[in-house]
Amino acid sequence: AYDQNREYLGCMKGSRIVGLLDGKSEEELCRWTDSLALEPVVRKVSARLPYRFVRLLLPSDSIALGELSFYTEEGRIGNVRIITPMRATGRNEVPGMITDGLGATGYRGRVAERLVDIDLGKEYMVSHIGMTSYLKTQLFCPDEFELRYWNNGWKTVERKQADHKGYLVFEKVPRGALLMLKNCRWKGKTAERIFTYEKGDVKWE
């Protein structure tokens, strides 16, 4: 998984995002000159005009993203849609996972034209753009996973079995808590991952 993740992190190096007017590039909003970081990165944008449609220009025909987010000075733009057809290469993934607000989901695929058009829903003056890396899931069926939180010791939230989706959803999780995901089949410290979760982003410790 390490070599694959390194490949996914480098996949987006050289990507550019441009604002579109009448289907044509009007101005460059953001350029990602380096490989993506493991943690989400949000960059400031100096847009001259408001845009409804923006275009992600890829360095190759491959895309691998956990999340792509757009912001105004008032906050994150919701209901963002990918409108370019893509061919998935990850299991059970759809393009909407790039803009669903959940850093734990993601999408890996091929885009023959090396461009992805994105609909923000209406015109916005974009002030920031964020990217979250795509990482290979380690949640394989039929492994069971237990979510715990720290409160003067590790307390169990819930135990769930992984399925074909590649991610798990837990409910009634304490906000702002230090969390741990434990693979109940594995032994030793490698079976445990400590993290925090805030505003859709998983931050591994």
Task: Label every PLM stretch briefly.
Residues 149-150:
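C-terminal end-helix/capping segment
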Residues 33-36, 158-162:
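Short beta-strand segments within Ig-like beta-sandwich modules, predominantly Fibronectin type-III
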Residues 1-50, 60-128, 134-141, 171, ...:
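Disordered, acidic Ser/Thr/Pro-rich linker "stalks" and the adjacent N-terminal cap
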Residues 175-182:
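C-terminal beta-strand-rich structural cap/linker in extracellular carbohydrate-active enzymes
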Residues 51-55, 178:
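Short, conserved beta-strand segments of beta-strand-rich sandwich/propeller modules, principally
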Residues 133-134, 163:
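Extended charged/polar low-complexity repeat regions
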